[in-house]
Protein backbone atom coordinates (compact mmCIF):
# COMPACT_ATOMS: atom_id res chain seq x y z
CA UNK A 1 0.00 0.00 0.00
CA UNK A 2 1.29 3.47 -0.86
CA UNK A 3 0.31 6.25 1.51
CA UNK A 4 0.76 10.00 1.04
CA UNK A 5 0.93 11.69 4.42
CA UNK A 6 0.34 15.31 5.28
CA UNK A 7 -1.16 14.95 8.71
CA UNK A 8 -2.02 11.32 9.09
CA UNK A 9 -3.28 11.37 12.68
CA UNK A 10 -6.54 13.22 11.96
CA UNK A 11 -7.16 11.21 8.80
CA UNK A 12 -6.67 7.91 10.63
CA UNK A 13 -9.16 8.92 13.30
CA UNK A 14 -11.71 9.88 10.63
CA UNK A 15 -11.20 6.60 8.79
CA UNK A 16 -11.41 4.52 11.94
CA UNK A 17 -14.80 6.05 12.68
CA UNK A 18 -16.09 5.30 9.18
CA UNK A 19 -18.76 2.57 9.31
CA UNK A 20 -17.87 1.51 5.75
CA UNK A 21 -14.47 0.33 6.97
CA UNK A 22 -16.11 -1.52 9.84
CA UNK A 23 -17.47 -4.01 7.30
CA UNK A 24 -15.04 -6.76 6.39
CA UNK A 25 -14.53 -5.46 2.85
CA UNK A 26 -11.06 -4.06 3.54
CA UNK A 27 -9.67 -5.98 6.52
CA UNK A 28 -6.04 -5.40 5.52
CA UNK A 29 -6.56 -1.65 5.26
CA UNK A 30 -8.32 -1.50 8.61
CA UNK A 31 -5.52 -3.54 10.19
CA UNK A 32 -2.95 -1.04 8.92
CA UNK A 33 -5.01 1.96 9.97
CA UNK A 34 -5.45 0.62 13.49
CA UNK A 35 -1.77 -0.29 13.69
CA UNK A 36 -0.74 3.07 12.26
CA UNK A 37 -2.74 5.13 14.70
CA UNK A 38 -0.88 3.47 17.56
CA UNK A 39 2.62 2.97 16.15
CA UNK A 40 3.16 5.63 13.47
CA UNK A 41 1.74 8.58 15.40
CA UNK A 42 4.88 10.71 15.14
CA UNK A 43 6.68 8.99 12.29
CA UNK A 44 4.79 10.00 9.15
CA UNK A 45 3.85 13.64 9.40
CA UNK A 46 5.92 14.84 6.46
CA UNK A 47 5.08 15.54 2.83
CA UNK A 48 6.33 12.27 1.41
CA UNK A 49 5.30 8.92 0.04
CA UNK A 50 5.44 5.95 2.38
CA UNK A 51 5.20 2.25 1.60
CA UNK A 52 3.47 0.00 4.10
CA UNK A 53 3.69 -3.78 3.79
CA UNK A 54 0.24 -5.21 4.56
CA UNK A 55 1.85 -8.38 5.90
CA UNK A 56 4.20 -6.43 8.15
CA UNK A 57 2.71 -2.97 8.85
CA UNK A 58 5.56 -2.07 11.20
CA UNK A 59 7.88 -2.07 8.17
CA UNK A 60 7.38 1.53 7.05
CA UNK A 61 9.49 2.78 4.15
CA UNK A 62 9.66 6.50 3.36
CA UNK A 63 10.47 7.16 -0.29
CA UNK A 64 13.17 9.83 -0.15
CA UNK A 65 13.37 11.62 -3.43
CA UNK A 66 13.20 15.32 -4.28
CA UNK A 67 10.78 14.70 -7.15
CA UNK A 68 8.30 12.84 -4.92
CA UNK A 69 7.49 15.90 -2.86
CA UNK A 70 3.78 16.25 -3.51
CA UNK A 71 0.64 14.17 -3.50
CA UNK A 72 -0.27 12.27 -6.65
CA UNK A 73 -2.00 9.13 -7.86
CA UNK A 74 0.52 6.30 -7.40
CA UNK A 75 0.21 2.74 -8.60
CA UNK A 76 2.71 -0.11 -8.21
CA UNK A 77 3.76 -1.95 -11.38
CA UNK A 78 2.64 -5.55 -11.98
CA UNK A 79 6.18 -6.79 -11.14
CA UNK A 80 6.24 -4.58 -7.99
CA UNK A 81 9.57 -2.98 -9.01
CA UNK A 82 8.24 0.43 -10.09
CA UNK A 83 5.72 3.04 -9.04
CA UNK A 84 4.02 5.34 -11.54
CA UNK A 85 2.56 8.58 -10.23
CA UNK A 86 1.69 12.10 -11.28
CA UNK A 87 1.99 15.56 -9.79
CA UNK A 88 -0.59 18.26 -9.55
CA UNK A 89 -0.39 21.26 -11.85
CA UNK A 90 2.51 23.63 -11.09
CA UNK A 91 2.42 27.45 -11.41
CA UNK A 92 3.14 27.22 -15.15
CA UNK A 93 0.23 24.80 -15.69
CA UNK A 94 2.27 21.60 -16.14
CA UNK A 95 1.82 18.19 -14.53
CA UNK A 96 4.59 15.59 -14.45
CA UNK A 97 4.34 11.87 -15.03
CA UNK A 98 6.94 10.17 -12.83
CA UNK A 99 8.35 6.65 -12.67
CA UNK A 100 10.05 5.52 -9.46
CA UNK A 101 12.51 2.64 -9.63
CA UNK A 102 11.91 1.08 -6.20
CA UNK A 103 15.16 -0.90 -6.28
CA UNK A 104 17.44 2.13 -6.82
CA UNK A 105 15.09 4.77 -5.36
CA UNK A 106 15.53 6.81 -8.55
CA UNK A 107 12.78 8.83 -10.23
CA UNK A 108 12.46 9.33 -13.98
CA UNK A 109 10.33 12.06 -15.54
CA UNK A 110 8.37 10.34 -18.29
CA UNK A 111 6.72 13.53 -19.45
CA UNK A 112 5.25 16.92 -18.64
CA UNK A 113 1.73 17.74 -19.74
CA UNK A 114 0.21 21.22 -19.91
CA UNK A 115 -3.28 21.76 -18.58
CA UNK A 116 -5.69 22.85 -21.33
CA UNK A 117 -6.27 26.60 -21.38
CA UNK A 118 -10.04 26.34 -20.85
CA UNK A 119 -9.46 24.32 -17.67
CA UNK A 120 -6.87 26.70 -16.22
CA UNK A 121 -8.90 29.81 -17.13
CA UNK A 122 -11.86 28.43 -15.20
CA UNK A 123 -9.67 27.32 -12.28
CA UNK A 124 -10.63 23.67 -12.85
CA UNK A 125 -8.40 20.91 -11.53
CA UNK A 126 -7.29 18.02 -13.69
CA UNK A 127 -4.98 15.09 -12.98
CA UNK A 128 -3.24 12.47 -15.11
CA UNK A 129 -4.35 9.46 -12.99
CA UNK A 130 -1.71 7.10 -14.44
CA UNK A 131 -2.45 3.37 -14.55
CA UNK A 132 -0.38 0.35 -15.61
CA UNK A 133 -1.47 -2.25 -18.12
CA UNK A 134 -1.14 -5.93 -17.15
CA UNK A 135 2.24 -6.30 -18.90
CA UNK A 136 3.87 -3.37 -17.10
CA UNK A 137 5.01 -1.87 -20.42
CA UNK A 138 2.22 0.64 -21.01
CA UNK A 139 0.84 3.53 -18.97
CA UNK A 140 -2.60 5.00 -19.54
CA UNK A 141 -3.19 8.64 -18.57
CA UNK A 142 -5.96 11.20 -18.80
CA UNK A 143 -4.66 14.48 -20.19
CA UNK A 144 -5.89 17.73 -21.67
CA UNK A 145 -2.58 18.85 -23.23
CA UNK A 146 -4.05 18.54 -26.77
CA UNK A 147 -6.81 21.04 -25.91
CA UNK A 148 -9.50 18.60 -24.79
CA UNK A 149 -9.80 15.77 -22.29
CA UNK A 150 -8.46 12.55 -23.79
CA UNK A 151 -6.95 9.21 -22.78
CA UNK A 152 -3.41 8.42 -23.91
CA UNK A 153 -1.38 5.21 -23.81
CA UNK A 154 2.36 5.65 -23.37
CA UNK A 155 4.85 2.85 -23.97
CA UNK A 156 7.65 2.80 -21.41
CA UNK A 157 9.10 -0.52 -22.55
CA UNK A 158 12.35 1.07 -23.84
CA UNK A 159 12.84 3.09 -20.65
CA UNK A 160 12.29 -0.01 -18.50
CA UNK A 161 14.81 -2.03 -20.49
CA UNK A 162 17.42 0.75 -20.06
CA UNK A 163 16.75 0.95 -16.32
CA UNK A 164 17.08 -2.81 -15.89
CA UNK A 165 20.52 -2.71 -17.59
CA UNK A 166 21.86 -0.13 -15.14
Model feature map: region roles:
Residues 61-75, 105-132:
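Conserved blade-ending motifs and adjacent loop-strand segments that build the rim/top face
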Residues 8-45:
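Membrane-proximal basic amphipathic "stem/tether" segments
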Residues 17-27, 46-64, 99-112, 158-162:
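Surface-exposed loop/turn elements that mediate protein-protein interactions on large endomembrane-trafficking
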Residues 3-10, 36-43, 84-91, 140-146:
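Beta-strand C-termini and the immediately following turn/loop, strongest in propeller blades
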Residues 1-4, 73-83, 90, 129-138:
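Blade-terminus and WD-like Trp-Asp/Gly-His loop motifs, strongest in beta-propeller folds
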Residues 10-18, 44-51, 92-98, 147-155:
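Structural motif
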Residues 124-166:
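Blade-level signature of beta-propeller repeat domains, shared across WD40, Kelch, NHL, RCC1
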Residues 49, 53-102:
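C-terminal structural cap/anchor segments
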Amino acid sequence: IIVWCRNLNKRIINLRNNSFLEKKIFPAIKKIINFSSINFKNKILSNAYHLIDVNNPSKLVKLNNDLLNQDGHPQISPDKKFIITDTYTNNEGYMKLLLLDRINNKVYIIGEFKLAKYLSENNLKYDLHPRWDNTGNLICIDSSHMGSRQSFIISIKNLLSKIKKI
